[in-house]
Structure formats: structure tokens, C-alpha cells
Amino acid sequence: MLEVIFLGTGGIMPTKERNVPAIALKYGGEIILWDIGEGTLRQLDTTKLSPMKIEKIFITHFHGDHYLGLMSLIQTMTLWKRERPLYIYGPKYTFEFIQNYLKSGFFRPSFEIHIHELGETRLKFKDYEIWSFKVDHGIPALGYVFKENDKRGNFDVEKIRELGLKPGPWMKKLEIKGKIEINGKLIYLEDVTGEPKKGVKIVYTGDTEQCERIKLFSERADLLIHEATYLSREDKGDSYHSTVEEACETAKRAKVELLALFHRAPRYKYEEYVQEANKICEYKFIIPQDFDVVRLGEKYELSSLR
């Protein structure tokens, strides 16, 4: 089970209703952050998520509402005597910005910080991959994909019998090794299991205008978190942001399972935004508020930590 915890769902500046962007992915005892706007540390405290469990932070771009919470997080980790390394990823200039950021106060982290600048990259970890892709925001900016590894299918009794075998202790050995020899014949795991189960796929656009790369990287995602700062093109003007209609168009074309409309402009009250979005968007969507949680497995569940 993967949990997507919306720590901040607004854009541009914090309001009484919502904080600026930060999303926590809770998976296998690890916490990954997508963006870390100012006040994220307080949001983590509200949700009882431990900052010490954060392993990786992926920053989409260097506008303040997406990264200004980083300093307070690093300082708190140091006060709590963290020793484990922290990995920070971002677009071009990430190394320069983070290095300058860390020189802006009279403290030094108690742990190593590894900084990685990404283009369109695929990062492989034990149980999942994270892909980065370029978006259109007028400055170096990235979107991210979390792709859980596919899981092997269940043992198929019919396939086992067709090979003249019976279920037994050998199955555990095969599961560990991937192949074993039985009665002089080499048996592979895929010979006796069903179709692999697709791993969960989540996409986060960060700030962007509508662009084709989002559609390409989002195809058949379980969840697309698409910025939808404005309700209309008139409100949007010439900014490098998206409207609700544009986010819905992309989700429909990419055939995603669920769309989350994200990064609402401060001018909109939640009720107003929901009312207008329901008129505009014909696709299956949610409008998360701060502390909402989406749990993804074979189906999704929506709840709140408020």
C-alpha cells in the first residue's frame, strides 16, 4: 500500500485555508517528499509524520513556494542529531541553489546531503523507480513519476500440474532463486505463476503549462497530480500555469485512473473552486485539501488526517 499525503495544496503563497505545495509519499517505511514549500515542517508535525524518516526530496523548480521549507527541515534534522544521509533532487541549478541556501545561516548539518541535478532521468531503487521529465514553466522545471516495480503473479496450480509437479516446499526455493532444477528439468518462476501485477504509478507535474510530455509520462497512471492553478484562461493570462480544463484534458488523453487538481491560486475559496471545477471537468477527479490522504493499492481510498 502506498499513501499519498497532501501536506500543502495551494499555490503561490500560504493562506488560512491551505499551505503551499508539499506532497509526502509513504511507502515501505520510507517517506519521499515532492516539493517542500514554507511551513512544510509544521504540516509534517500535524500529520505525525517524522521528518527523520524522510529519505529523498524531489524539488520541481526553484520558485519559493516549492522549496522554502527546506532550511527549517534540515535544521530540525540536525537538532535531532540525524546521521543518515539526505538525498535532494531537482532541475538544473539545484546544486548551486542548495549550496548557497546552506550557507545562509550559522549552522552546519549533522549529516551528509547528496545533491543531484536531473534532466529527463530514470532513477532505480529497490522496489520502485522515479522518473523525471521536463515541463513548461518558463524556468528549469521538472515533473516526477513514482513507478512501483511490477509484482510477480501468484502461483498457478494448473501450470504446476501441467509440468507434472505438486505444490510443495520447492515453491519457496523457486520464489527466492527464480529458477531451480527438479528431476533434471530447469523450472523458472514464470513457468508456474500467473501474469505479473502492475505496480502503482503516480505522476506529479509541479508547476507547468499544459504540455505533451505530461500526457506521455502519465499514460495509464493510477494517479495524476496536475497543477490547475486557475479556473479559466482569462484568470490564467500569460502565466506559465494550467487551468482546470487543461488538466482534465490531459488526464482524459492519458487515460489515467484518477486526477487530483492541485496548486489552487489564493484567490479561490475551496467551495468556489469545487463548484466551478464540477462544471468544467467531466473526468474522474478529486480536489485534495491539506492533510487529505490517497491510499493506492488495487483500488484507491481517500481520507483525511485533519
Curated annotation (Swiss-Prot):
Organism encoding this protein: Thermococcus sibiricus (strain DSM 12597 / MM 739)
UniProt entry tagged with the keyword Transmembrane helix: no
Binding site for Zn(2+) 1: H61, H63, H137, D207
Protein name: Ribonuclease Z
Disulfide topology: none
InterPro entries: Metallo-B-lactamas (IPR001279), RibonucZ/Hydroxyglut_hydro (IPR036866), RNase_Z/BN (IPR013471)
A single GO molecular function term of this UniProt record: 3'-tRNA processing endoribonuclease activity
Enzyme kind, highest EC tier: hydrolase
PANTHER family for the chain: ZINC PHOSPHODIESTERASE ELAC PROTEIN 1 (PTHR46018:SF2)
List of catalytic residues: D65
The family this protein is said to belong to: Belongs to the RNase Z family.
tRNA processing in keyword set: yes
EC number: 3.1.26.11
Xref: Pfam families: Lactamase_B_2
Functional description taken from the UniProt entry: Zinc phosphodiesterase, which displays some tRNA 3'-processing endonuclease activity. Probably involved in tRNA maturation, by removing a 3'-trailer from precursor tRNA.
Keywords tagged on the record: Endonuclease, Hydrolase, Metal-binding, Nuclease, tRNA processing, Zinc
Catalysed transformations (reactions): Endonucleolytic cleavage of RNA, removing extra 3' nucleotides from tRNA precursor, generating 3' termini of tRNAs. A 3'-hydroxy group is left at the tRNA terminus and a 5'-phosphoryl group is left at the trailer molecule
Cofactor binding note from Swiss-Prot or TrEMBL: Binds 2 Zn(2+) ions.
Residues at which Zn(2+) 2 binds: D65, H66, D207, H263
Subunit structure: Homodimer.
Cofactor(s) of this protein: Zn(2+)
